[in-house]
Amino acid sequence: MNITHIMAQTMYTQDMYMLINTCFDGTEHKFCTGHAKRKDSLAPIGLNQAKGNAEVINPKHFIRYIKNLDACDAIILHGLFNFKHFIFISRKKEWLEKTCWVIWGGDIYRYNEKSNRWGVKLTEYLKQKYACQIGYVATLVDKDLPLARQWYHVGGKHFSLSYPLPIQRPGVMQKLTDKGNKKGFGKKTVKVMLGNSATLTNCHMDALQELAAFAPEDMKLYIPLTYGFKGYEEYREMVVQEAVRIFGEHKVVPVTESMDGEAYSEFISDMDIGIFYNDRQQAMGNIAIALASGVKIYIRNDTTMWGNYEGRGFRIENAFTLSEETFDTFRYYDPVKKENNMALIRKYTDINLIRDKWKQLFTEM
């Protein structure tokens, strides 16, 4: 079996690459991924042959890239956010038929976004026209599947997948667990993480209004704003200005410097509360790290994520009720809930479970 993975450079690319090389025969897999756009990108990972047997192909080597698409037995499209790869895959029906589109969330929720950018419009056009011919589809949240079928007429065989995270690296989960077990809410400054990126779907402005009543309280707001879609810098500045207006500069910490996976996990593990006011499935890697670290989590109950966590037994708080809480109820995390959530996230992020899901996909494609 010769499988080609098309995956952008993200904070999680290294962990996927290592999963393939440690749990599968790396010689049967190739990764098509370019260099990070910026030196301070969320992908200072430099995938190369030294890290495993899976070959890494730069799409800029065009002839080699196209020959590989033609020769491989299966194509795994890790997210479909832009036209750059799909414009080639869609040229041949046989390429589409051997492709699995792994839906990340943002790639289907673009359907509801209005954009004048020609790249976004072209990507949506290609998805509308050719996604129905893709042979396989995978989701990270099963409730995203009906939306993909409704919006893009996806009809391929469905698989449920999970991605490896930095918390599966040696020793990381134990560090997070130890931190989580020690957490309590005594008289200390409450560290609150808001969102995961500088994207509109984080709904930062709405979340800040929900939190405004706590402005006089002893809390500090950490806002990850390292990346986003094109032009995100302007949105990032708006979020920071509004947060500072409400809470004051001394209580707001914009996170604009990128980190590798382990450093970012360490950052999240220092938080007491995580608020993800996202209006769609997003930030699940961040949420998993936070849950493992004993962080109290708030998400909206109108997203597919809510049903996903609730159905698995997690005790997550509804972000829509934030404005109804007192600061004491906000900062308090029931120890029973915390223990339950930490145990469940260890179960659902078990590397063997993740491996078996990918094994099923590779076997049945």
Predicted regions span which residues?
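Short N-terminal targeting/anchoring amphipathic segment
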Residues: 5, 64-85, 98, 273
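A charged, aromatic-enriched C-terminal amphipathic alpha-helix characteristic of glycosyltransferases
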Residues: 11, 326-365
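A conserved mid-protein helix/loop that constitutes part of the nucleotide-sugar donor-binding site
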Residues: 11-18, 199-213
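Active-site proximal beta-strand in glycosyltransferases
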Residues: 74-76, 92-113
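Nucleotide-sugar donor phosphate/pyrophosphate-binding loop at the beta->alpha transition
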Residues: 109-129
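A short, active-site helix/loop in glycosyltransferases that binds the activated sugar's phosphate group
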Residues: 126-172, 176, 357
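Conserved donor-binding/catalytic core segment of Leloir-type glycosyltransferases
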Residues: 173-202, 221-223, 346-347
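Nucleotide-activated donor-binding/catalytic signature segment of Leloir-type glycosyltransferases, i.e.
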Residues: 236-258
